[in-house]
Amino acid sequence: MNRIKEVLDKKGIKQTWLAAKLGKSYNIVNGYVQNRQQPRLEVLDNIARILDVDVVELIVSSKKK
């Protein structure tokens, strides 16, 4: 599971913008956001760089259980 959706929502960024920056289709990015598929590590690292967050923020919840 990843937290791409939460980070996008927090930053007010649209999936279409992220897809364009990644050079991937909206459908691919939507699959990542909806957790239907997981990005490869290098793609996850690229997403983190584009969103200006630590890659850990995309995979580890900051909420305490």
Segments predicted by a language model, with ranges:
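Short alpha-helical DNA-recognition segment
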Residues: 12-31
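DNA major-groove recognition helix of helix-turn-helix/homeodomain DNA-binding modules
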Residues: 42-57
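Alpha-helical residues within the helix-turn-helix
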Residues: 9, 20, 49
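A short, Lys/Arg-rich alpha-helix, primarily the initiator
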Residues: 1-14
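Short intrinsically disordered terminal tails
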Residues: 1, 64-65
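DNA major-groove recognition helix of helix-turn-helix
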Residues: 8, 33, 51, 59-62
